[in-house]
Amino acid sequence: MSSFDEQNTRLPSMTLVPMVVEQTSRGERAYDIYSRMLKERVIFLTGQVEEHMANLIVAQMLFLEAENPEKDIYLYINSPGGVITAGMSIYDTMQFITPDVSTICIGQACSMGAFLLAAGAKSKRYCLPNARVMIHQPLGGFQGQASDIEIHAKEILKVKKRMNDLMAIHTKKTLKIIEKDTERDHFLSAEEAKKYGLVDCVLTERKDVKNFSKK
């Protein structure tokens, strides 16, 4: 996780969720704002990536695939990173399902958040102009017997190699460059993330999406 926003991630999440009321032939129907956005095939990945959040995102993607396998899914990311296994469950589902998953960075996409941002469908990875992106190597700390520490150290090196391989594929950078740039926290602006290959387009207005998709 990035120390850049560590203090903010410790704050309790906002419990007040806005409700949206729609008029239907059967009368009024109320949705929380996230359920309403899900109807528009929009999913939010916000905060630290952990198992419960990952399960919810996977379930939403599978639901939207079952509802319409031809329409894109839009994954909005504002995350400081989190647990690798949780993030990889989201990543694998993104690659597994039939619909394209378009990724949009709002705020920040750090660590696993940046990895998932880069994993969006080709030519459908976006970043808002003042968002920040950060890539680095996996973090891990272990306690116990020396033999157990050695086992975990070997495992995290395997995970690091696998994530670097995948990042090289999605960014079209060489593995050597990825290994060098992720050795320490590597922050990028929206434009720098575009040049690096983490996103395809920096959006300033809604119409930018349509204009870019026509290219």
Swiss-Prot record:
Compartments reported by the entry: Cytoplasm
EC number: 3.4.21.92
InterPro entries linked: ClpP, ClpP/crotonase-like_dom_sf, ClpP/TepA, ClpP_His_AS, ClpP_Ser_AS
Top-level taxon of origin: Bacteria
CDD domains (UniProt xref): S14_ClpP_2
SUPFAM superfamilies with a match to the protein in the record: ClpP/crotonase
Keywords: Cytoplasm, Hydrolase, Protease, Serine protease
Catalytic activities: Hydrolysis of proteins to small peptides in the presence of ATP and magnesium. alpha-casein is the usual test substrate. In the absence of ATP, only oligopeptides shorter than five residues are hydrolyzed (such as succinyl-Leu-Tyr-|-NHMec, and Leu-Tyr-Leu-|-Tyr-Trp, in which cleavage of the -Tyr-|-Leu- and -Tyr-|-Trp bonds also occurs)
Top class in the EC scheme: hydrolase
Gene Ontology biological process: protein quality control for misfolded or incompletely synthesized proteins
Gene Ontology terms for molecular function: ATP-dependent peptidase activity; ATPase binding; serine-type endopeptidase activity
GO cellular component, one term: endopeptidase Clp complex
Entry annotation: catalytic residues: S111 (nucleophile), H136
Transmembrane segments: none
Quaternary structure, from the entry: Fourteen ClpP subunits assemble into 2 heptameric rings which stack back to back to give a disk-like structure with a central cavity, resembling the structure of eukaryotic proteasomes.
Family named by the database record: Belongs to the peptidase S14 family.
Name of this protein: ATP-dependent Clp protease proteolytic subunit
